[in-house]
Amino acid sequence: MAGLTLKQQRFADEYIISGNIEQSAVKAGYSRSYARGNAHKLMANVSIKAYIDERLEVLNSE
């Protein structure tokens, strides 16, 4: 998906696997302190949310 950084894409992929916002942010490369205080902002990002929705649609159709 265009518009996402590699770190944002990693976050989204990790979130699809775990469902845990903070853990996904850390695994994607964000610092623990950022993840603790700001991971919810990643989920509010329209591009990230669209990427997650698209990936889930593909996974659910398989």
Specify the residue positions occupied by each region the protein language model found:
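N-terminal, charge-rich alpha-helical recognition modules
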Residues: M1-E62
